[in-house]
């Protein structure tokens, strides 16, 4: 009888040891899986944060390009208004000349002087507008390039 009890105790001890071993292995596997998941989540968060920082930098660069374009458009509007004011001045001078009587020589001298001033004004206006349009085109090109490169 004592042999049976000893045999049963041995079997019970072996089964208990196997169960404890299996439990320790299962816990170890679960722990490894949890650690792996934790490290994976941390890496994903780092990648997302880096992507967010990069996107924010790109948006700031685009905001700067937009601000530059707005300033250039504002300068174009100022030039446009300046040209309109000068054209109104020219029209006023034409009206003034037309309403007064001049001797032929005076009128020719006045006309030539007026023509020179008008040609010079036209050149100056064209140069200013050309420069402003070139700046605007450069900003537009930079903006398109930045958008294509960044998004």
UniProtKB/Swiss-Prot annotation:
Record localization: Cytoplasm; Nucleus; Chromosome
Coiled coil: 56-140
Record bears the keyword Coiled coil: yes
Record key words, sorted: Chromosome, Coiled coil, Cytoplasm, Meiosis, Nucleus
Effect on the protein upon substituting residue 78 to E: Decreases meiotic gene conversion at ade6, crossing-over between ade6 and arg1, and double-strand break (DSB) formation at a DSB hotspot
Disruption phenotype: Abnormal linear element formation. Decreases meiotic gene conversion at ade6. Decreases crossing-over between ade6 and arg1, and lys4 and his4. Abnormal sporulation.
Signal peptide residues on this chain, from the entry's feature table: none
Main location as per UniProt: cytoplasm
GO biological process: meiotic DNA double-strand break formation involved in reciprocal meiotic recombination
Gene Ontology CC annotation, any one: chromatin
Aminoacyl-tRNA synthetase found in the keyword field: no
Domain of life: Eukaryota
Subunit structure: Component of linear elements (LinEs), which are similar to synaptonemal complexes, at least composed of rec27, rec25, rec10 and mug20. Interacts with rec10.
Function: During meiotic DNA recombination, binds to and may help activate DNA double-strand break (DSB) hotspot sites.
Protein name: Linear element protein Mug20
Organism: Schizosaccharomyces pombe (strain 972 / ATCC 24843) (Fission yeast)
The encoding gene: mug20
